[in-house]
């Protein structure tokens, strides 16, 4: 007996059954990507959601339920405590002009070298302005400050030329270094490959070019100028006197002689 055609398996008055038979055939003929797109296509973020999502993570941690965040991917850092700081050079904006800058320009001085995610953002201008406003305090202890991001020098200059009341920097006293190739950020282990910018990394480099301190912040929280000053002062004290600084040490506070007998002098006073 001759086999009936597929579409002849039902009578004309069974249209619903005929459509059910056709559905698997249509799904088989559709490209796989088209079917997958029905399940995986993401809804575009609204303007309100965009305001809560910035630089690879939420600006406000409490808003985490609004938008999912991919895991960050960091490069292996060449920056190691007590070792020479990774060399860098590039174009910076200094006093409104483009100038070439390199790490060795600061040999003989301490250097606070910090990364921030992006120009024209939220927390970043508050940090740069805070460090810039207190530059003389750093210079009084033979220390300079340089800020760096993956933006171009042209974007840096545009940000500097934007008034502070509009989220700009205005006249700023510290150099803004451009890391457009991302190489400096990668060498220092702060570059987020999945986001195209950096974490808030801060590095204290001593007058011999040795890296003494590393701080890494996630994106929503800025850094403390007071704590950075304290750390520089503490490292400089130990360099000069050979004694070590206890927790919370500030200039004028007691230090510890680092040997079994010498330490007793400090702990006897403390207790």
Curated annotation (Swiss-Prot):
It is an enzyme of class 1 (oxidoreductase). One of its GO terms (cellular component) is cytosol. Residues 1-37 form the signal peptide. Keywords: Antioxidant, Cytoplasm, Disulfide bond, Endoplasmic reticulum, Oxidoreductase, Peroxidase, Redox-active center, Signal. The enzyme can be inactivated by further oxidation of the cysteine sulfenic acid (C(P)-SOH) to sulphinic acid (C(P)-SO2H) and sulphonic acid (C(P)-SO3H) instead of its condensation to a disulfide bond. It comes from the Eukaryota. GO terms for molecular function: identical protein binding; molecular adaptor activity; molecular sequestering activity; thioredoxin peroxidase activity. Pfam families: 1-cysPrx_C, AhpC-TSA. CDD domains: PRX_Typ2cys (cd03015). Its EC number is 1.11.1.24. It is found in: Cytoplasm; Endoplasmic reticulum. The keyword Cytoplasm applies. The active site is at residue 124. It catalyses: a hydroperoxide + [thioredoxin]-dithiol = an alcohol + [thioredoxin]-disulfide + H2O. Its main location: cytoplasm. Residues 79-237 form the Thioredoxin domain. GO terms for biological process: cell redox homeostasis; extracellular matrix organization; hydrogen peroxide catabolic process; I-kappaB phosphorylation; male gonad development; negative regulation of male germ cell proliferation; protein maturation; response to oxidative stress. PROSITE patterns: THIOREDOXIN_2. Belongs to the peroxiredoxin family. AhpC/Prx1 subfamily. Thiol-specific peroxidase that catalyzes the reduction of hydrogen peroxide and organic hydroperoxides to water and alcohols, respectively. Plays a role in cell protection against oxidative stress by detoxifying peroxides and as sensor of hydrogen peroxide-mediated signaling events. Regulates the activation of NF-kappa-B in the cytosol by a modulation of I-kappa-B-alpha phosphorylation. The active site is a conserved redox-active cysteine residue, the peroxidatic cysteine (C(P)), which makes the nucleophilic attack on the peroxide substrate. The peroxide oxidizes the C(P)-SH to cysteine sulfenic acid (C(P)-SOH), which then reacts with another cysteine residue, the resolving cysteine (C(R)), to form a disulfide bridge. The disulfide is subsequently reduced by an appropriate electron donor to complete the catalytic cycle. In this typical 2-Cys peroxiredoxin, C(R) is provided by the other dimeric subunit to form an intersubunit disulfide. Homodimer; disulfide-linked, upon oxidation. 5 homodimers assemble to form a ring-like decamer. Can form heterodimers with PRDX1. This is Peroxiredoxin-4.
């Amino acid at each position: 007996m001759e086999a009936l055609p597929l579409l002849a398996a039902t009578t004309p008055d069974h249209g619903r059954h005929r459509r059910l038979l056709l559905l698997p055939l249509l799904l088989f003929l559709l490209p796989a990507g088209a079917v997958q797109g029905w399940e995986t296509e993401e809804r575009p973020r609204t303007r309100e959601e965009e305001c809560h999502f910035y630089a690879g993570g939420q600006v406000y941690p409490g808003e985490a339920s609004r938008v999912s965040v991919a895991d960050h991917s960091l490069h292996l850092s060449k920056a190691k405590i007590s070792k020479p700081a990774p060399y860098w050079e590039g174009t910076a904006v200094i006093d409104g002009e483009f100038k070439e800058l390199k790490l060795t320009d600061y040999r003989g001085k301490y250097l606070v070298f910090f990364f921030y995610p992006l120009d024209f953002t939220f927390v970043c201008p508050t940090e740069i302005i805070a460090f810039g406003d207190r530059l003389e305090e750093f210079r009084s202890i033979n220390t300079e400050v340089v800020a760096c991001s993956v933006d171009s020098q042209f974007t840096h200059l545009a940000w500097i030329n934007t008034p502070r009341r509009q989220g700009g920097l205005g006249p700023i006293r510290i150099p803004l270094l451009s890391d457009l190739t991302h190489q400096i950020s990668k060498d220092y282990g702060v570059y987020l490959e999945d986001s195209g910018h950096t974490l808030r990394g801060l590095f204290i480099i001593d007058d011999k070019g040795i890296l003494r301190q590393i701080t890494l912040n996630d994106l929503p929280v800025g850094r403390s100028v007071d704590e950075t000053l304290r750390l520089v002062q503490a490292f400089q004290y130990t360099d000069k006197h050979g004694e070590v600084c206890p927790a919370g040490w500030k200039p004028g506070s007691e230090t510890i002689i680092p040997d079994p007998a010498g330490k007793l002098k400090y702990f006897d006073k403390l207790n």
